[in-house]
Amino acid sequence: MNVSDFDYHLPEERIAQEPVMPRDASRLLVLNRASGAITHRTFRDLPDYLRPGDVLVVNDTRVIPARLLGRKPTGGAAEILLLEQLDAATWRALIGGRRLTEGATITVLDKSGEATDLVATVIAEGPESLREVRFDQPLDEWLDTVGYVPLPPYIHTPLQDDERYQTIYARPAGSAAAPTAGLHFTPELLLDL
């Protein structure tokens, strides 16, 4: 089997640009493993396909505003996607922008595009765009002011409501990306399970 066996054409206009309302009205593709029959249902029908003893595993972390926009000393744009907090001011991150080697600095921009007093310095380089960055101040105090909820690269519509990319059972902050498989659950559906 080759990975290319799973390639298929998906027209861009068929990709939803915002979550469906209500959440459980999203479509559900069901495969009958015995017969190979495929049926199309809605996510709220999920309990019809689960049996006693089945287990659902969920990611209950809240998505943090982990996408930061910044400016290099040259004036060029830079983007930081926070992945893992190493200490109060140090993060492992993906950084988009050329020539951001060890020692490079990025001034973080606020949501209006203005420079803030928050500066990130690249302290270690990894493969591809992976870097360790140290902020000159603890980032927790800044995230809500300067950070954006990261969206998948195929979503081009600006996010109107950050809560739409949180699951209804999200508790501890920590995800750098929305656990999209869990976005379809509603309180009523969880009670039905």
Predicted regions and their residues:
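A cross-family signal for N-terminal binding/gating loops and helix N-caps
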Residues: 1-193
